[in-house]
């Protein structure tokens, strides 16, 4: 398998969304950028903030779309097209209602599960074959509460569990980047429960 060349963190721009559950993808790529001494810069042609880092000797692009969640695919397509990055070389990091806080899972392809960011990316890439890193945020219990729930800050114990899942995920990203996704999946799925 080829490795990951683009890691996209999903979220919404602006200070009012910064600490909300829906911005879990931003949290992970911010930490990744910091750990690997990258520098974010706003890039209009890619509709977002971008950074380039090196992991395991390979260049990896980081992207935070500034289009708001529902139009994330616009930014992903622009960068992927410009650098000739294939869908299976893209890892999209996003909040996941169907996993408890503290649980993180890699997955390739599949549906969008009602996540509008994933839906837009799959539509614009004309493929759902990109990789996902699903960061559990839990579910409010009532489907009608979802929109409100994802745009609120997690409780303190949930935030701690999310932070631990982010760190566990970051430990496995070098394997994912170097094309050892099966190993990364096994390690993460065993560790981040």
UniProtKB/Swiss-Prot annotation:
Site (Stabilizes the basic form of H active site to accept a proton): 95
Coiled coil segments of this chain: none
EC assignment: 3.1.1.29
Catalytic residues in the record: 22 (proton acceptor)
Site (Discriminates between blocked and unblocked aminoacyl-tRNA): 12
Entry keywords, A to Z: Cytoplasm, Hydrolase, RNA-binding, tRNA-binding
UniProt cross-references to PANTHER family, sorted A to Z: PEPTIDYL-TRNA HYDROLASE
Family named by the database record: Belongs to the PTH family.
Name listed for the protein in its UniProt record: Peptidyl-tRNA hydrolase
Source species: Chromobacterium violaceum (strain ATCC 12472 / DSM 30191 / JCM 1249 / CCUG 213 / NBRC 12614 / NCIMB 9131 / NCTC 9757 / MK)
């Amino acid at each position: 398998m080829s490795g990951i060349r683009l890691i996209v963190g999903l979220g919404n721009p602006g200070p009012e969304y910064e600490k909300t559950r829906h911005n879990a993808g931003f949290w992970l790529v911010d930490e990744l950028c910091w750990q690997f001494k990258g520098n974010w810069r706003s890039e209009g042609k890619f509709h977002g903030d971008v950074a380039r880092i090196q992991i395991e000797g390979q260049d990896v692009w980081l992207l935070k779309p500034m289009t708001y969640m529902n139009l994330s695919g616009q930014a992903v397509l622009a960068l992927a097209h410009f650098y000739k990055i294939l869908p299976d070389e893209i890892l999209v990091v996003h909040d996941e209602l169907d996993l408890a806080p503290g649980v993180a899972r890699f997955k390739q392809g599949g549906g969008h599960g009602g996540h509008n960011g994933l839906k837009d990316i799959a539509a614009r890439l004309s493929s759902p074959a990109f990789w996902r890193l699903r960061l559990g945020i839990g579910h409010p219990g009532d489907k009608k509460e979802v929109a409100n729930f994802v745009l609120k800050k997690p409780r303190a114990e949930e935030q701690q569990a999310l932070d631990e899942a982010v760190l566990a995920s970051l430990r496995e990203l070098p394997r994912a980047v170097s094309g050892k996704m099966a190993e990364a999946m096994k390690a993460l799925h065993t560790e981040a429960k």
